[in-house]
Regions:
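N-proximal, solvent-exposed amphipathic alpha-helical segments enriched in charged/polar residues
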Residues: 1-13
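NTP-dependent nucleotidyl-transfer catalytic core
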Residues: 10, 14-38, 42-543
Length: 543
């Protein structure tokens, strides 16, 4: 449609213009454009006059049943029934076809419990990867984990005290209790570091040991517990519905690479000051940050620059590299990206970080440093109880669907207000509601003995629903372009509501229009399923 309007503008005014379409109130039309207002200044004409000229030409198009002009020059277009039906056969565009995209997902650190904030970032990144794949990109899911440093020292301090020099005591911990054990160890270490100067000094030494691993007992315990952590992370993100990663990066393999590049790019990119290497990030919307300390150790910035090099080495045809992190790290990542692009010019414009908001509970912001966390294990247990209390069957697919949707329906960067009972409701804007809506539609189709066929025409009662169905491709294209899954969530919820209104007023099974209506129901069910798949949510046939 944009192309048709652009051609009319070119023919009438010899102007090349990018036509933007919006969805007005359905009573005004299916699409609206302000192209006449855009043309008013370059043409020196009244926008209403321009709009009338464009509208007159658009009325000749058989795809449009009605074209009107409103206000100062807005053009409203209503599609013909056949055009609406044809639009249901459209597929989303694939503007990123052939592009190579690397996206970090499933990235909690080992030696700590995976909590609800980790789940938000992992689910969002996984869904963005789905959108990129729908857009034609070759998507590589990878993960990055901090396996060295202070948090490791805290956990190892408590673990070594717990086993008292006997590594075999770790074998006595049941598999299903390992995550609880690791979480408890981290909390004990964090508390000790805060309360005891002596313990903090010991923890600092144990943190240093995580970089060198030259103590046999430490190394053995470290490797066992690190493996436990990764097993737990993989299990948890699998239960969340995430696609498995293809490459796991860890912080211990990045430092030397990062330090080497930073030193090579000094003073071109970095400044050396009192033995430290500093990036003047304040010039790039970030803050001045030390990447290598005066002690010679690489800090977070050096590690992240090493990671970027590893990804570029593993994926030399990289077109886009995406990370997803909390809003508190947004300025830091602006600095890392700026430093990386200056150091490796081939990556300019290819590195992006998306900042998420907070997950807000009644107890406030979570912190794994104090143990005030909602772990994934606890979260799944609570969802299971809530679904059972609501009369549902708490399968992993249903739990994951409710949880994912609760995160994804919020615009990226917005805070997620988390209420488990609301999240599993079958009557609100929830994943459970949409899964139920899909199962209900499949149930209707299962009751019909009519052959499912694509509608050949529309009755008046069909038009609101079918026009809503026709919006799907545009919504997905918008979500793909901005990498914002909430557009898909909003659309699917509105679509399910529209179908409910249709179904309440129009009998399907046993109606003299049954054959026609099951065709519409089938399209509705297929679109629901496709939209839920983008969100990483299973569309069950029964629930």
């Amino acid at each position: 449609m944009e192309q048709i309007i652009s051609q009319v503008v070119k023919q009438l005014f010899d102007q090349d213009i990018s036509v933007q379409l919006t969805r007005p109130d359905p009573k005004f039309g299916d699409f609206a454009t302000n192209v006449a207002l855009q043309l008013a200044k370059p043409l020196g004409k009244n926008p209403r006059e321009i709009a009338e000229m464009i509208a007159e030409n658009l009325r000749k198009e058989e795809d449009f049943s009605e074209v009107s002009v409103a206000g100062p020059g807005f053009i409203n277009v209503k599609l013909s029934d056949q055009s609406v039906l044809n639009s249901l056969k459209k597929e989303p565009t694939t503007k990123r076809a052939g592009q190579t995209v690397v996206i970090e997902t499933n990235c909690p650190n080992p030696f700590k419990a995976m909590h609800i904030g980790h789940a938000l970032n992992a689910i969002l990144a996984d869904t963005m990867a789905n959108l990129l794949a729908v857009d034609g990109a070759i998507v590589h899911r990878v993960s990055y984990h901090g396996d060295v440093g202070t948090h490791v020292g805290k956990s190892m301090w408590a673990i070594l005290r717990e086993i008292d020099g006997d590594v075999n005591k770790l074998n006595e911990i049941p598999t299903d209790k390992r995550n609880e054990f690791m979480s408890r160890m981290y909390v004990e270490g964090a508390r000790a570091a805060k309360e005891s100067p002596e313990a903090k000094a010991e923890i600092d030494e144990l943190a240093k040991q995580s970089f060198v691993l030259d103590d046999p007992l430490y190394k053995q315990v470290y490797e066992i517990c690190k493996s436990w952590s990764f097993d737990e992370i993989d299990s948890n993100v699998g239960r969340l519905g995430n696609v498995p990663i293809e490459r796991r990066y860890v912080e211990s393999e990045t430092e030397e690479l990062g330090k080497s590049l930073i030193k090579e790019k000094t003073p071109e990119v970095f400044t050396k000051s009192d033995g430290a290497y500093v990036f003047k990030g304040s010039k790039y919307g970030a803050f001045d940050n030390v990447f290598i300390g005066s002690h010679g150790n690489g800090l977070y910035g050096a590690h992240d620059m090493g990671l970027i090099q590893l990804k570029y080495k593993d994926y030399p045809n990289l077109d886009l590299s995406i990370t997803v992190n909390g809003e508190e790290q947004a300025a830091y990542f602006r600095g890392v990206i700026a430093a990386s692009e200056l150091s490796i010019p081939a990556l300019k414009g290819k590195l992006f970080n998306y900042a998420t908001g907070l997950v807000k509970l009644t107890t406030g912001k979570m912190s794994s440093r104090t143990g005030e966390v909602v772990t994934i294990g606890w979260l799944f247990d609570e969802f299971k109880k809530a679904i059972e209390n609501a009369g549902g069957e708490p399968t992993d697919d249903v739990i994951a669907g409710a949880l994912r949707y609760q995160f994804l329906k919020v615009k990226i960067g917005g805070d997620v207000i988390f209420d488990i009972n609301d999240a599993v409701s079958l009557t609100g804007n929830t994943g459970s509601y949409l899964q139920y809506a899909h199962a209900r539609a499949r149930g209707i189709l299962a009751k019909s003995d009519k052959e499912i066929a694509f509608p050949t025409g529309l009755f008046d009662e069909d038009k609101m629903l079918v026009r809503k169905l026709s919006e799907y491709v545009d919504v997905v294209d918008r979500a793909k372009e901005s990498l914002e899954p909430h557009h898909v969530c909003t659309y699917l919820f509105e679509l399910a509501q529209e179908f409910n209104r249709y179904y309440e007023k129009n009998q399907v099974i046993g109606s003299d229009k049954e054959a026609h209506r099951v065709g519409i129901v089938a399209i509705y069910a297929d679109i629901l399923k496709a939209g839920l798949a983008i969100l990483g949510i299973v569309a069950p046939n029964k629930i």
